[in-house]
């Protein structure tokens, strides 16, 4: 009898502990993003996993913690293409984002030098298309102001640098190099370097000064995670990290100092030994390859010349090498993510990857797919290749892209609806820090065809449906990295990763969505961000 009583007490104790671990979340609506687009009023969690969903009354007791949200619960938003660590690790650099002229840049550099006594000056984030005069400057003013110190000013896309003579001297370019890099080293009419370098030379200069760079900035990475949470991001795909970034992030995840789910691709040439941490929130997915450059730097590889130039851009990896990388990924069952912006690069990527991905579920991705020839859209479906796109790029670029590509670009550039119609699904991201991490801006841009900060409602790009846009930031983003069984929708058995907003993205009007507030972000059942009242 005594033994039975003890067993009874143990069962009661276990039941009480189980009840204490239960968390009930209630909201105005829960949008699940499941196959039927089901909605609910409450969700029950246990140990960070979704256990039950419902609309009617839930019989609870004081052992079940209940939180009521005045808002709408969504699956945790996933940024399907961003550079999580890039901006955080660049905090020591002179911030040139949103500058409106080269004069403003010079003023910032002068102020920066007073407070930063480094052996060089490194600035980051300028975009000449934000200036009143978008003409690229040369190094003369930098040479005059900083004759004895290397000055490196990287464009917002990371594919172009303006530097002074002292920085160019670090490259030690020979006459042979000048021929090798003729498309990447800008020369004036007299054959003198202007200070503008691109692509491989950018990487080469970065490597030369990397030994002088701060190796650790843990606090900045942790702060960056909170910035993502504040914007409603509950997971991310980090596209193209190097060994240094990997080591920093892996250590922070191991210590539990970073929690945001991170599904990462490494730059080609680096494969980590330890590809998944115990917390299952820092997971290697595959290799990222840069096939071409960018439109802003005029290095995206096109089928036709850029307007008023004799250049079609730059192919950074030849077809044979891309084929070799494809074989490597295929044999190792890794995903392959190819940066392809120009229509020529996209055609090469589609046809090369397609040899291995056709009729197979490899989930290989083309990142950006900004310019695609009309005859090539169908290949995304034919070869089962995922378009991974960033709608806010189209908003940022629309003022100058026609002048760069011609009127034909209106049919081939930033054609997200055509991509979706072909591929049947797509992953949406921001390319942060090139664009802001704001997922509401992503949704707004691709649904309403305009920028969230624009005052008019003129359609800039063809829109897609609200449901498809939401899926692109949730279940399709998860599917793009083989995580759809764990995250991306609110279903029983999945992780409790939620984004809670003040608005209903599927029904509220355009102006109301523009003013959406992130109420809370939840990862693994724990509130990692809550809007202060």
Regions found by a protein language model. Give the residues of each.
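Hydrophobic, small-residue-rich alpha-helical packing segments that form membrane-like cores
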Residues: 270-272, 284
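A structural microfeature
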Residues: 51-52, 519-520, 529
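Short beta->alpha connector loops
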Residues: 241-243, 268-270, 369-372, 504-506
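His/Asp/Glu-enriched, well-ordered alpha-helical/loop segment
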Residues: 327-337, 344-364, 368-369, 375-378, ...
């Amino acid at each position: 009898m005594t033994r039975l009583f003890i067993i009874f007490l143990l069962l009661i104790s276990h039941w009480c502990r189980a009840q204490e671990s239960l968390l009930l979340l209630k909201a105005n609506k829960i949008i699940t993003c499941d196959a039927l687009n089901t909605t609910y009023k409450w969700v029950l969690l246990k140990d960070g996993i979704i256990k039950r969903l419902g609309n009617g009354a839930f019989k609870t007791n004081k052992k079940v913690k209940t939180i009521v949200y005045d808002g709408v619960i969504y699956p945790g938003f996933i940024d399907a293409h961003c550079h999580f660590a890039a901006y955080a690790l660049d905090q020591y650099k002179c911030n040139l984002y949103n500058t409106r002229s080269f004069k403003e840049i010079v003023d910032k550099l002068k102020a920066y030098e007073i407070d930063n006594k480094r052996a060089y000056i490194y600035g980051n984030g300028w975009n000449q298309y934000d200036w009143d005069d978008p003409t690229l400057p040369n190094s003369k003013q930098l040479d005059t102001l900083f004759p004895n110190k290397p000055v490196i000013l990287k464009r917002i896309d990371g594919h172009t640098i303006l530097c002074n003579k002292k920085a160019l001297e670090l490259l030690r370019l020979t006459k042979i190099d000048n021929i090798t890099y003729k498309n990447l080293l800008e020369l004036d009419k007299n054959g003198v370097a202007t200070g503008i370098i691109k692509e491989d030379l950018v990487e080469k200069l970065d490597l030369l000064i990397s030994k002088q760079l701060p190796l650790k900035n843990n606090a900045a990475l942790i702060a960056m995670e909170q910035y993502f949470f504040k914007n409603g991001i509950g997971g991310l795909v980090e596209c193209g990290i190097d060994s240094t970034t990997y080591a920093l992030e892996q250590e922070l995840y191991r210590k539990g100092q970073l929690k945001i789910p991170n599904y990462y691709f490494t730059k080609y040439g680096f494969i980590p030994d330890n590809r998944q941490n115990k917390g299952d929130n820092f997971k290697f997915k595959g290799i990222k390859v840069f096939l071409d450059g960018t439109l802003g730097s005029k290095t995206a590889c096109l089928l036709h010349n850029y307007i008023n130039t004799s250049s079609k851009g730059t192919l950074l990896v030849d077809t044979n090498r891309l084929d070799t990388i494809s074989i490597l990924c295929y044999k190792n069952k890794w995903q392959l993510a190819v940066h392809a912006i120009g229509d020529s690069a996209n055609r090469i990527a589609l046809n090369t990857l397609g040899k291995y991905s056709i009729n197979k579920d490899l989930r290989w991705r083309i990142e950006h797919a900004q310019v695609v020839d009309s005859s090539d859209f169908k290949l995304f479906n034919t070869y089962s290749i995922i378009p991974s796109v960033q709608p806010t790029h189209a908003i940022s670029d629309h003022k100058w892209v026609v002048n760069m590509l011609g009127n034909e670009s209106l049919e081939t550039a930033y054609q997200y609806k055509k991509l979706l119609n072909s591929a049947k699904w797509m992953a949406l991201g921001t390319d942060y820090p090139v664009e802001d991490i704001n997922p509401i801006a992503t949704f707004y841009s691709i649904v309403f065809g305009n920028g969230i900060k624009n005052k008019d409602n003129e359609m800039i790009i063809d829109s897609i449906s609200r449901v498809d846009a939401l899926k692109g930031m949730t279940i399709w983003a998860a599917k793009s990295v083989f995580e759809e069984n764990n995250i991306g929708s609110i279903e029983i058995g999945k992780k409790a990763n939620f984004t809670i907003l003040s608005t209903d993205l599927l029904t509220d009007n355009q102006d109301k969505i523009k003013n959406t507030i992130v109420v809370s972000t939840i990862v693994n059942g724990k509130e990692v961000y809550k809007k202060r009242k």
